[in-house]
Amino acid sequence: MATRHLSTQPAEQHHRRRFLDAALAVLTDRGVAGLTVRGVAERAGASTITVYTRFGGRVGLLDALYERAFDLLREDLQAVPPETDDGIADLLEVAQAYRRFAMASPARYGLMFERSVHDYDPDPALRAGVVATTFVEFVTKINRVSPPGVSARDCAYLLWTSMHGLVSVELTIRSQSHIEDWFLDPTAEAHGRMYRHGVLAMITGLGLRN
């Protein structure tokens, strides 16, 4: 199935980015409730008809925003330091970049992974495309440290689900009032240490090594 995401010519990219930046700002500042065509148009200083013209409506705008969010994640993963002789350390750097991305904008992360917009279901072809271009970063790093005969794709999936679980729980905990006698202190540093410990435990359990 073709995506609902509307393609544009290169000359339109600047205007398109302006609307997507506005949509990301609305999502961060006002949450999902503010993510309407009118809200995005107002933030971009444009009319609602302009948004409809460029994206075909709310679903087209959400598709484009969904795709843009994954573009930003991929850029962050690609921005980690160049590969070193320590493949495990390099993999851990990518995992840390993933957590930083999630913490930078929980609302954006929710749009990507948590179905936070209850009536929005990204087009399957669009989902397949963003997954293929983003999670290849994990597969590439894992390929360097996978034992012979072990599927790097399987390892990447298991590692990502662990990372996603840790991040999702952290976001939930940090959005709520702290309770006494919880497993760890309610600080970013404590959560960061637990995340690193969990990722390393999964790496070890998968038998990944330099």
Predicted feature locations:
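Amphipathic alpha-helical segments used for helix-helix packing
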Residues: 103-122, 168-179
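Helix-turn-helix
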Residues: 18, 26-60, 64
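Amphipathic alpha-helical packing segments from all-alpha helical-bundle domains
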Residues: 120-147, 153-157, 189-203
